[in-house]
Structure formats: structure tokens, C-alpha cells
UniProtKB/Swiss-Prot annotation:
Summary of subunit composition and partner proteins: Part of the 50S ribosomal subunit; part of the 5S rRNA/L5/L18/L25 subcomplex. Contacts the 5S rRNA. Binds to the 5S rRNA independently of L5 and L18.
SUPFAM superfamilies: Ribosomal protein L25-like (SSF50715)
Gene3D superfamilies tied to this protein: Ribosomal protein L25, beta domain (2.170.120.20), Ribosomal Protein L25, Chain P (2.40.240.10)
Organism: Pelobacter propionicus (strain DSM 2379 / NBRC 103807 / OttBd1)
Similarity annotation: Belongs to the bacterial ribosomal protein bL25 family. CTC subfamily.
Record-given protein name: Large ribosomal subunit protein bL25
Gene Ontology molecular function: 5S rRNA binding; structural constituent of ribosome
CDD domains named among the record's database cross-references: Ribosomal_L25_TL5_CTC
Length: 199
């Protein structure tokens, strides 16, 4: 989990016209919401928002908000980011103000480590779930969850319930869900079957 810092400005005016003006000034319109508070409209410099989400943690980076009146020094994560369908640029951002002592639910990417023995034997790696839903304290949000697939053989899978998780992190997905598998038969068996078919 990476910690970032980002300047924000409160704004009293909302609407499509205001949002367009902000974007033309290299600002991103947004809203900050959280437990026990009314949503607050804000604007953020485009490059600052980019920097706040830089690195492996991405939208799960823990951000210290600077400015914004009562929001100053609050901690937040990016809950939702809208992009332009054509340009891919940021259109609007939702920031979730978090309490460091209260658990929250986030989506974390899965990263595979190593080359599966089943792939070396001619199998095909099937990476079915690239993300996991987890629950943890804000300070324990992992940048990613790593799975070592080195010993994964043909016709075998690694399920959600078999994944080693960082301390303080609880996975919410069905423990029986296969995350990564090796499909197919061992290369030697496939070759033997092909030879038998030709004979």
C-alpha cells in the first residue's frame, strides 16, 4: 500500500457546464464522501490526480487530502474514476474518505509469479480471475496479491481459499472459485494420443 498526498479545492457550483470549464482548465471535478458526512464537491489538478494514483497501488493508494477546509489532512482512496470514452482522460472522480480504524472493502489485482510446471509440460495457463475482493483496514490495503504458480501441474487449479493473504486481509470471494488453472494434457500424453490416431 502506497501513501500519496493531493491538493483539493472545495467548489460551491456544480453541473455539466461547471465541469466542462474545470476540465478545460486542467482540473478534474470530483466529490468526497464518507461515513458521517455529506458529500462535498471538489476540484483537483489533473496532474496531481495522476500522481496520486501512480505506482502499483493505483486507485487503492491511500491519499492524504490537503486543503478543502474541513477535509484537510483527511485520508481517502479513489472509489470511482470516470474516463472519456474516446480520449481516456479523467472526467470525474469519487473519493471515499476513510477512517483508519475501520475496515473497508476494495478490489486488489492478482499477480502471478513463476512459470507453471504444467505449462512446461505443454498445458495452457488459464488466468480466470485477475482481481480479488478483500476487506481490511486502510493501512493494510495490499498493492497486489501474489500467487506462485511454479508447482501448478496440468489439470490442477489454485482456488481462492488456497491463496496466502497478507496479515489483516480477508478475501470476500468464494473460496472454491478457481483463480488460475493449467488446462490440457501433458505434452508426452498428447503426442502419444496423436501418434495413436495416425496409426
Amino acid at each position: 500500500m502506497q501513501q500519496k498526498q493531493m491538493n483539493i479545492e472545495l467548489r460551491s457550483k456544480t453541473g455539466k457546464g461547471i465541469s466542462r470549464k474545470l476540465r478545460s482548465a486542467d482540473m478534474v471535478p470530483g466529490v468526497v464522501y464518507g461515513k458521517g458526512m455529506d458529500p462535498m464537491a471538489v476540484s483537483i489538478n489533473y496532474r496531481e490526480l495522476q500522481a496520486a494514483m501512480a505506482g502499483e497501488g493505483g486507485q487503492n493508494n491511500l491519499i492524504t487530502l490537503v486543503g478543502g477546509g474541513s477535509l484537510d489532512q483527511s485520508m481517502a482512496i479513489v472509489a470511482d474514476l470516470q474516463r472519456d470514452a474516446v480520449k481516456g482522460t479523467y472526467k470525474h472522480v469519487d473519493l471515499h474518505r476513510v477512517n483508519m480504524s475501520e475496515k473497508l472493502r476494495v478490489t486488489v489485482p492478482v499477480v502471478l509469479k513463476g512459470t507453471a510446471i504444467g505449462v512446461k509440460e505443454g498445458g495452457l495457463l488459464d488466468f480466470a480471475h485477475h482481481e480479488l475482493h478483500v476487506e481490511c483496514l486502510p493501512g493494510n490495503i495490499p498493492d497486489h496479491i501474489e500467487i506462485d504458480v511454479t508447482s501448478l501441474a496440468v489439470a490442477h487449479s489454485i482456488h481462492v481459499g488456497e491463496i496466502a493473504l497478507p496479515e489483516g486481509v480477508k478475501v470476500l470471494d468464494n473460496p472454491k472459485t478457481p483463480v488460475v488453472s493449467v488446462l490440457g494434457r501433458v505434452k508426452e500424453e498428447a503426442e502419444a494420443a496423436a501418434e495413436a490416431a495416425e496409426a
